[in-house]
Amino acid sequence: NVSGATFQAQCSAGSYQPAYAQTSCFSANAGYYVASPASANQTACELGTYQPYIGQSSCLNAQPGYYVGSTGSTNQTACSVGTYQPYSGQSGCLNAAAGHYVPTTASIQQYECAVGTYQSATGQDKCESASPGYYVNSTASDRQFPCVPGTYQPAIGADSCLIADPGNYVDTQAATAQIACSEGSYKPYAGADSADDCMLADMGYYVPLTGSIAQTPCALGSYAANQGQITCDSASPGYYVNSAASVQQHPCEAGNWQDLAGQTSCN
């Protein structure tokens, strides 16, 4: 300031003076700016911008991954986990969409949930693994899907279901295990969805074990007169069975005898 001056000096950009007859200018505060020389006022940084220093002629745009949610700000704020911001100069962050997640702060993008995982909510920092009995077979899924009857899944995070093995069935949705066909029944094919799919052993045959895929013919000297037998019956004394897979025993003819059980002929 010079005494006896014949002119007035302008405040430079970044400074201002609201009063008359002053000998100096004020530097713009942090969070504010003065864009033009000879200004009487400072201006607050707008939403999406900030200024950490004094005496500035402009504000800084928030960087991607950050935001400024109030005017007159001196700093930008990192987007929290579960949110992201791909653009600069923004006043807020975007929630991760359903089927997506954001695991870190200051992220500029969201990430798709991988196969075997899903996320039904928005704004999340991780995806959920598919539960046992369920599967997720695509990326970015917002739900898990139940295994249909005839299939099952015992593990978490699966991308498909397992088909019921031969000798087994699955009769409910979202099953975590298959059920073995009971003794006396069998199933030669995969994917059974009902206990009724297990077939009873035919007469002349038997099934001794659960989870069987085939029936077994009764051996010589034995027979099965009923369906669904788990063992064959031995021919009684006085009777014989001389062929496999027999449905009945035969009496010894007149003049012949048989004292023992399970025989194939008479004496």
Residues of each region from the PLM?
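Disulfide-rich, cysteine-dense extracellular ectodomains and adjacent flexible linkers of secreted
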Residues: 1-267
